């Protein structure tokens, strides 16, 4: 079993301040009870998740520190797994306003996920083709 990284310090240096601001807005300004579940993933963890059917990719934005997963809790402190409270939508809209991609918009919804890569592909990132980020 691989380690699960939850701290924002494990995110890519370009994403850390964005994620910190997002977390502050969601928690402090909007009053949403939430926490970060996972930031950076190593390859072993990604393989585990793919085998378990919890990820569809061999390599993704988590593997380069440009994605995070989070959980929201309703007013009773109950973990909201399907956005019935609308809290994930609020957090997702904040992420999108900051230039992020929110998993709640995908065909296979991933409400508690967002990634920040400013319009470039993972391959461009891996190839070092994005100035100022890599």
Task: Kindly give the residue locations of the regions a language model identified.
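Catalytic cores and adjacent binding grooves of peptidoglycan-active enzymes
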Residues: 56-134
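Residues at alpha-helix termini
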Residues: 29-30, 52, 98
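Glycine-rich loop at the start of a catalytic domain that most often binds anionic cofactors/ligands
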Residues: 48-55
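Charged, low-complexity surface patches
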Residues: 15, 38, 83-84
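Acidic helix-start/capping segments at beta-turn-to-alpha-helix junctions
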Residues: 36-47
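Active-site acidic/histidine clusters and adjacent loop/turn architecture
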Residues: 1-35
């Amino acid at each position: 079993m691989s380690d699960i990284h939850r701290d924002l310090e494990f995110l890519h240096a370009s994403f850390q301040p964005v994620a910190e601001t997002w977390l502050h807005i969601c928690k402090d300004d909007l009053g949403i009870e939430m926490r970060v579940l996972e930031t950076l993933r190593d390859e072993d963890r990604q393989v585990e998740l793919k085998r378990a059917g919890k990820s569809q990719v061999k390599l993704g934005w988590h593997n380069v520190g440009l994605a995070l997963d989070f959980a929201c809790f309703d007013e009773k402190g109950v973990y909201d797994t399907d956005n019935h409270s609308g809290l994930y939508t609020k957090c997702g809209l904040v992420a999108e306003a900051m230039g992020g991609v929110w998993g709640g918009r995908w065909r296979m919804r991933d409400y508690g996920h967002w990634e920040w890569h400013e319009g470039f592909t993972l391959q461009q990132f891996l190839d070092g083709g994005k100035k100022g980020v890599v």
